[in-house]
Curated annotation (Swiss-Prot):
HAMAP family recorded: UbiA
Family, similarity comment: Belongs to the UbiA prenyltransferase family.
Gene from which this protein is expressed: ubiA
Compartments in which it is found: Cell inner membrane
EC numbers: 2.5.1.39
Protein name: 4-hydroxybenzoate octaprenyltransferase
Topological relation to the membrane, as annotated: Multi-pass membrane protein
Function: Catalyzes the prenylation of para-hydroxybenzoate (PHB) with an all-trans polyprenyl group. Mediates the second step in the final reaction sequence of ubiquinone-8 (UQ-8) biosynthesis, which is the condensation of the polyisoprenoid side chain with PHB, generating the first membrane-bound Q intermediate 3-octaprenyl-4-hydroxybenzoate.
Organism: Marinobacter nauticus (strain ATCC 700491 / DSM 11845 / VT8) (Marinobacter aquaeolei)
Length: 294
């Protein structure tokens, strides 16, 4: 069998690119994927077209990677002061700034071409908003304590795009899902920001974790409650059944677990709570898919 052995420096460079794009850390991709699938399945009232499933699965992967590249570009001068990020390839000098920008542009271009070639005009128009949100979010932490709100919009923009691709229109359900996901993103990314709060305070990075202060867990709980309420509204308006509501109950139960994990506000507990949100999103998707299938 033919084997190709890459030179050591090439292998090291590819590994740095993979770390820059978070190929080794799929949690962000999964958190973006589940709400996209919610929209695809609900807009199709069952299984979406195979083409849209492939396009949006790949699009989620590419745009999340693009977002990581531009985020590290924006934060390159701050990341060296934060324990969790000081060894990132761009901060450590193993990847240059222009390379991160080029990767962002290239991945956005590939995603845009998929939309142009395989979806409809409405989805194409919406894609410009998605690209803009992906670009501006990383810079918001310089100017506002609500960068998580911009991240929520960026992470939720695939919902109207997926809906438009499948149904060629948008509905009230689209925006209910969008709102639920924005609130959910703010909740789980606040948990993530609590991991870095002490370092962020030192270097002047703004976040909801800093804004909320000692009320952080209470506000996260409020956001989580609002997510569950809105998803119940989605179920009622879409006339969904027991499987869907079981998925929402599972999400609510996991939200309680997240509060337990973050009870002492330490790095490990908050990070575990953040990671566990993957299962909350999956639970809703599984319930929705089963409900529409049966």
């Amino acid at each position: 069998m033919l084997q190709i052995t890459l030179p050591t420096h090439v292998h090291a460079r590819l590994a740095d690119y993979a770390r820059l794009l978070r190929i080794d850390r799929p949690i962000g991709t999964l958190l973006l994927l589940w709400p996209t699938y919610w929209a695809l399945w609900l807009a199709a009232e069952g299984g979406p077209s195979f083409a849209n499933l492939v396009i949006f699965t790949l699009g989620v992967f590419f745009m999340r990677a693009a977002g990581c590249a531009i985020n590290d570009f924006a934060d390159r001068d701050w990341d060296r002061h934060v324990k969790r990020t000081k060894d990132r390839p761009l901060t450590a000098g193993r990847v240059r700034a222009w390379e991160a920008v080029a990767l962002f542009a290239g991945l956005c271009l590939v995603s845009f071409l998929m939309v142009v070639l395989f979806t409809n005009t409405l989805t194409l128009y919406l894609s410009f908003g998605g690209a803009l949100l992906a670009f501006i979010y990383p810079f918001m932490k310089r100017y506002t304590h609500l960068p998580q709100l911009f991240l929520g919009a960026a992470f939720s923009w695939a919902i109207p795009m997926a809906w438009a691709a499948e149904a060629n229109q948008l509905s009230q359900l689209t925006w209910l899902l969008f709102t639920a996901n924005v609130l959910w993103t703010v909740a789980y990314d606040t948990l993530y920001a609590m991991v870095d709060r002490d370092d962020d305070l030192k270097v002047g990075i703004k976040s909801t974790a800093i804004l909320f202060g000692d009320a952080d867990r209470a506000i996260i709980a409020l956001l989580q409650t609002m997510v569950v309420v809105i998803l119940v509204m989605v179920g009622q308006r879409a006339e969904l059944g027991s499987f869907y509501y079981l998925g929402v109950v599972a999400m609510a139960t996991l939200f309680v677990y997240h509060q337990y994990l973050a009870r002492e506000r330490n790095r490990e507990g908050c990070f575990k709570a953040f990671l566990n949100n993957n299962w909350a999103g999956f639970a809703v998707f599984l319930g929705l898919a089963l409900d529409l299938a049966f």
